[in-house]
């Protein structure tokens, strides 16, 4: 009788390692010690270890060391597949185990082996375990491997060198000749890796990078990977040096005609990111992307439509020729491509097809992930500004996204979009509030409920039928948690303030809240009831309607620090709170910038995919910024020389005085007191062969009459890689005016050579100095931010008799948004009435700023600006009001040289 075939359960897994136990596998390592070696058995055990590591299982140092040294016994095996697995295991464990350095002799022996596989893998492991003391001993092996004819060995050496460049930059830089030779290798991958390494070696020398790129353009690389990288290098040179040399642009344009799709796409993408681009250049790039839209390859279609989506934000006219092709992509089976196609069409489309596009998006909204939904929401937001009459369709669509399942990030982006529509289109207010009232009945995110209640309280009383919203608000008091109940109480009180007919009902509802179990709810209700009974409309307006001028998280940290310090002789000053907030950038669209620059990269290594370690300067900054600017006051007050200076009034941002990858990295922070300025120099020694002692900064002022040298605090010893601070204090007389001047600076120190292998110092050393960038004292060093509830009212109150009006031009500032940022940065004052927000492509704008001097005199600034006829400069009319004419002159001196 025929045997019965059993059907395997679909849920049954036949994966061998699924239920693997770490302890059991560790016991299996004894197979490595067997003699003779059984390749098949050892290969299985190594595969199990590699699976555990990839799964995220952690090994202690002892466990990792035992496994590592057991695996080294496999160097005796001649089985190539087993050796390959052994190299992989050693590479993974090398960063965990102790004394991995012992295998260097075996690895260097393999680097001379006739089998290329051994040589390449040995190099990869050496890269992991080598430090600055070992690399000089095996340097020759790396140099030989870089110029090796076998592409596997050469590529392994080049990529390993990219990693070693972070550990021992001075040694790797000596290999530039070998790397230059490797660029001529016939292998596509070797050319690519050689160019990547050579660029990193030279990246802090702009002239050297420019020469490198120029030479490679003439020699025409064969590798498409290297050509793509070279295009990015060209973009870097163009952006960093602002060069007008056509050779770089012409090379990128020539790559548009490349037969290789990757090279052609990279060229088109780069042209789309240029700040100054001609119609001919952009049309050629868009033409290439248009061809890719019709490609059979999903990756090409996705890359092209994503680039066009980004371009549509800055140059929608250039994208219009692709509309028909993108409409064909709306039905693409890849939902990511379809979403980007529709959002791009929304940015460049016309009013007649908006409804159709929105309906098409709604049909497959559930099939795309939240990241792409955020892209859709952003497109809808920009669409509301372009076609305000379509607000009903936009609000309904956004509300659908809000109600569907999704992350808080998506919900927040959607709510922000609805708020933008309400702010820009007053007619949309009632339909938006109605939809949001329904949403908070079943909202899973307290943060969103609080924001919506705030909006209803602000806008609900001003609608045609305010009473309809009260039921939704009071339901939150009855049904939700303490945070939401407190927000609901405030929202109810706003109705009583802004809509007089409901005042009595509001008082009744607030009285019911007096028995709430939550302190915050009871306290708010008590305060509002007291103000209503006293009919204190002015204070009610201030409490209920004025926005907090700083981010609440920053305010909380500053208040906690104020309480912790325990010095209550002076009241808390809200102007000391930082206004910096984090913003979200969708990773789908990217930033359109080159992935590398002459400074330290923030996004990591573009070739190897590993994160870059922060440079010494950045580490130095982060150590102090982690606790906020207020930490400076605590630290400086503990230094005896500065303890008599009084209260710290202001600290500047970090000012770089050297390049980030030089021998000595120095930046400065200016600390302003009532009669003193303390310069804090953060110094880092990046040379492991040197130890510095008696480190100080010599400052020579451009106008010595304005100030007097007070004291200097040097660094006793500055070893390799340990950031430390030295200080210089000067004194000035406020009655004589603030000391606006510049300083030439030099870092002075004694150098003692260090043997990196033993740590021994070469006494007695020698004196040396290192030139630093000039440092300036500018007006914003003596100006603090100030916040007012209503700028317009305060502006009117100030007399025009003492106002100062000055016109000037910001040369080379080609956009209003850039001009606004430059003025705010130059004065260091606080924007008022959200005037820092600029409408896209606006040709004129008015910016309002408020600040105060160090003696607490208020300053109000109004900056009217517009682009000139050439569209290359911005004309500014600056009006300054304060009670002191000399203060007005002082503020304007930030822009006008007297």
UniProtKB/Swiss-Prot annotation:
One of its GO terms (molecular function) is structural molecule activity. HEAT repeats lie at residues 62-99, 170-207, 280-317, 319-352, 353-389, 392-427. The keyword Transport applies. It is a peripheral membrane protein. Residues 613-626 have a biased composition (Low complexity). Keywords: Cytoplasm, Cytoplasmic vesicle, ER-Golgi transport, Golgi apparatus, Membrane, Protein transport, Repeat, Transport. One of its GO terms (cellular component) is endoplasmic reticulum-Golgi intermediate compartment. SUPFAM superfamilies: ARM repeat (SSF48371), Clathrin adaptor appendage domain (SSF49348), Subdomain of clathrin and coatomer appendage domain (SSF55711). Residues 592-631 are annotated as: Disordered. Gene3D superfamilies: Coatomer, gamma subunit, appendage domain, Leucine-rich Repeat Variant, TATA-Binding Protein. It comes from the Eukaryota. Pfam families: Adaptin_N (PF01602), Coatomer_g_Cpla (PF16381), COP-gamma_platf (PF08752). It is found in: Cytoplasm; Golgi apparatus membrane; Cytoplasmic vesicle, COPI-coated vesicle membrane. GO terms for biological process: endoplasmic reticulum to Golgi vesicle-mediated transport; intra-Golgi vesicle-mediated transport; intracellular protein transport; protein secretion. Belongs to the COPG family. The coatomer is a cytosolic protein complex that binds to dilysine motifs and reversibly associates with Golgi non-clathrin-coated vesicles, which further mediate biosynthetic protein transport from the ER, via the Golgi up to the trans Golgi network. Coatomer complex is required for budding from Golgi membranes, and is essential for the retrograde Golgi-to-ER transport of dilysine-tagged proteins. Oligomeric complex that consists of at least the alpha, beta, beta', gamma, delta, epsilon and zeta subunits. This is Coatomer subunit gamma. It comes from Dictyostelium discoideum. The lineage of its organism: Eukaryota, Amoebozoa, Evosea, Eumycetozoa, Dictyostelia. The gene is copG.
